[in-house]
């Protein structure tokens, strides 16, 4: 079966109308959205290949639902192990590293590199290199303030953002997007790989999970091996935009390919075979190798200052422990703590895991076994230990106009290891009165708080369930009231399909007060979709 895909670039933004919205069940290989073409001269500064490169990585996981799949620490650890096997050409099985064609199998070359989860975070905290967050979307487009809010220093960490909706357009089957080396992006904490958790590791099949390898290849300055409709990334089969010869992917030993997904029996514009199993190709059948030329190109990219800062000894001393088995306490649950109601009542348990030791059994003593800094007035914290886990309990009531960060430090006395690594774990008191899980909201149409809820239908209808007599108003971003109505019998349905795509505010006022929901109406081929975005107002 031939599967159609589309490419999103700065010059041609087709995501909103692309094939992915026609067939939400088919995963899309790579919606590459690189902000710069690969640098041709970087290959001239290639270092020798006799070095083992270690790249510190942090995975930021946003939300819990990825097209019915889930992303756990164990899944990420396994996915990264497999990606390292791909780069080092040690993948085995039916889709082994290399190519069945001897012409290309002899070109299969390992890169001596390890993408390793960070062990020390930016605040000096011990970490698994995996941070779980509230649901977010759209990091595949240019949104500096939001990305910078979560990003760890790009000069020390390779940031991988795991989310379901990469472009914030309601499409949940785009697999991944990455950017070439760029110092300005690194300096401003915008260098990144954005990837869909639905296609991470064992959440998908063995071949398609290698799209992550493909995206990491882009991160190290590799372009696609194929020509995509003679647009921004030609590979040698066609002339450039002005009739000039084009350099293709800047790699001599990857033959030109007229199109993506060419197979073993397809010939290119020169009448020759293509390296169809290359990781930088699109294939739903097999991708399993980098060539020697591509490895040389990645070695050159590793000398660029936007990438060399990642593997320096100075960086490693700040992001890795001297001994990976050293006892430490890491955050296991989400970084954000959400209130249970609109009044700002908090009753939240934060899970911390002890690695290399055990927790002290029973209640822990504040000020001795653990300390808390910056907790808002009105909230209190207590902690208990049990086996490998420490549970931090935060209770109380507070009204916030914005998220508030605080820190907890688990002292060695809370564990069985006197030399347990001590670091300040950053946590956030979220001002959202419900946990914002957009993926769940989009699929099930539910956001609940204080007995009220807002739900949506694919035709643009919004249903508000609230106490009888509650006032419901819909405003545009300019504050103009479009609809004002009252709930007659616990439910009210409003039709917004005729207003067109854009941002609207739905306010529900009852005896419990007023809560505003920010919603985004997105025009799609199969009707108007509404995404509910309850945020701090």
Please provide the spans of the model-predicted regions.
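Propeptide-to-catalytic entry region of secreted or membrane-anchored zinc metalloproteases
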Residues: 21-153, 315-320
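Bacterial Sec-dependent N-terminal signal peptides
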Residues: 1-27, 527-537
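Extracellular/luminal low-complexity segments enriched in Ser/Thr/Pro
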Residues: 389-403, 495
């Amino acid at each position: 079966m031939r599967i159609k895909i589309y490419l999103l670039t700065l010059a041609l933004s087709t995501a909103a109308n692309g094939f992915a919205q026609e067939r939400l069940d088919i995963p899309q290989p790579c919606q590459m959205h690189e902000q710069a073409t690969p640098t041709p001269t970087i290959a001239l500064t290639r270092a020798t290949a006799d070095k083992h490169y270690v790249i510190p990585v942090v995975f930021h996981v946003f939300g819990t639902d990825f097209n019915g799949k889930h992303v756990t620490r164990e899944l990420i650890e396994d996915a990264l192990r497999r990606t390292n096997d791909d780069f080092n050409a040690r993948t085995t099985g039916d889709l082994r590293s290399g190519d069945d064609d001897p012409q290309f199998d002899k070109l299969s070359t390992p890169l001596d590199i390890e993408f390793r989860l960070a062990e020390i975070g930016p605040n000096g905290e011990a970490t698994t290199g995996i941070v779980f967050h509230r649901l977010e979307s759209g990091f595949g487009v240019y949104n500096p303030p939001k990305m910078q809010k979560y990003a760890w220093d790009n000069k020390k960490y390779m940031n991988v953002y795991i989310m379901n909706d990469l472009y914030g357009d309601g499409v949940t089957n785009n697999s991944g997007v990455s950017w070439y080396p760029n110092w300005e992006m690194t300096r401003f904490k915008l260098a990144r790989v954005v990837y869909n958790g639905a296609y991470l590791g064992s959440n998908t099949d063995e071949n398609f999970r290698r799209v992550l390898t493909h995206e990491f290849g882009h991160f190290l300055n590799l372009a696609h091996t194929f020509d995509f409709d003679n647009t921004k990334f030609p590979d040698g089969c066609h002339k450039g935009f002005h009739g000039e010869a084009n350099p293709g992917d800047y790699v001599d030993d990857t033959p030109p390919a007229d199109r993506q997904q060419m197979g073993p029996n397809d010939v290119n514009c020169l009448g020759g075979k293509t390296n169809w199993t290359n990781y930088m190709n699109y294939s739903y059948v097999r991708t399993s190798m980098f060539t020697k030329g591509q490895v040389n190109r990645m070695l050159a990219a590793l000398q660029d200052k936007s990438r060399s800062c990642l593997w320096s000894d100075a960086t490693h001393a700040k992001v890795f422990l001297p001994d990976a088995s050293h006892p430490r306490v890491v955050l296991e649950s989400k970084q954000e703590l959400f209130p249970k109601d609109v009044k700002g009542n908090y009753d939240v348990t934060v899970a911390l895991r002890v690695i290399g030791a055990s927790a002290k059994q029973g209640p822990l003593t504040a000020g001795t076994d653990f300390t808390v800094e910056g907790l808002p007035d009105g909230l209190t914290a207590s902690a208990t230990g049990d086996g490998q886990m420490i549970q931090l309990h935060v209770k109380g009531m507070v009204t916030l106009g914005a998220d508030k960060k605080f820190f907890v430090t688990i002292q060695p006395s809370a564990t069985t290891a006197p030399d347990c690594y001590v670091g300040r774990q950053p946590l956030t008191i979220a001002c959202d009165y419900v946990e914002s899980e957009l993926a769940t909201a989009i699929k099930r149409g539910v956001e609940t708080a204080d007995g009220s809820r807002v739900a949506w239908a694919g035709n643009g209808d919004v249903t508000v369930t609230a106490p009888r007599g509650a006032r419901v108003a819909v405003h545009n971003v300019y504050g103009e009231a479009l609809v004002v109505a009252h709930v007659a019998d616990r439910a009210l349905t409003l039709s917004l399909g005729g207003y067109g795509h854009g941002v609207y505010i739905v306010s529900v006022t009852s005896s419990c007060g007023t809560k505003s929901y920010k919603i985004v109406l997105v025009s799609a081929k199969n009707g108007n979709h509404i995404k509910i975005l309850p945020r701090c107002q």
